[in-house]
Amino acid sequence: MKKEFRSAPNFSEQKHVNVDRENSTIKNIEIAKYGRNKNLTFFDDKFLDDLVKKGNEQKQGVKSRFGHPNMCASSLGTFVGRYKNFRVENRKAYADLTLDPITKKTSVEGKGIKMYDYIMDMAESNSDMFGNSIVIMGDEYENEIENEKGEKEWENVQVLHSLLASDLVDDPAATDALFSVGNDFGVT
């Protein structure tokens, strides 16, 4: 049965990020990675490839919001931009986020700062304190997966039907941070 899935956030220890303020773009954002995520489902290589394919099929880009919508709050006013240029490298899916001009006019609720400045400043100086969380339609099945030690383990493998959004959150499930650990992307 198809159901909506929101991954838990991923964080990174990366301190140097690819933030291009001139073009309102944050490059090389880790979207998802191979393995068991914080929601206890497993992203295999096929899932990552399908995620990249579905992301690149959306010619306008994949919607990104400031946090996930929930039953207590509307998502209206939380749009921040679009992800494009999806790709897989070393069993991790990456994309580039271009912030919409509206983020320069929209304030982070109760924080006294514009979304644009908050997101760009955090990406430059505290990329390990937030990440993104994919919102998909999919289902899962149980399958035997070989772990790093060569042992077989049963996992709930996620199957992707559609990619709805990838939201900026303070606690991502599908990654460890905004950027992949161990890569020096530099600041532009």
Regions found by a protein language model. Give the residues of each.
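Short, flexible beta-strand-to-coil junctions
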Residues: A32-R36, H68-N70, M137-E142
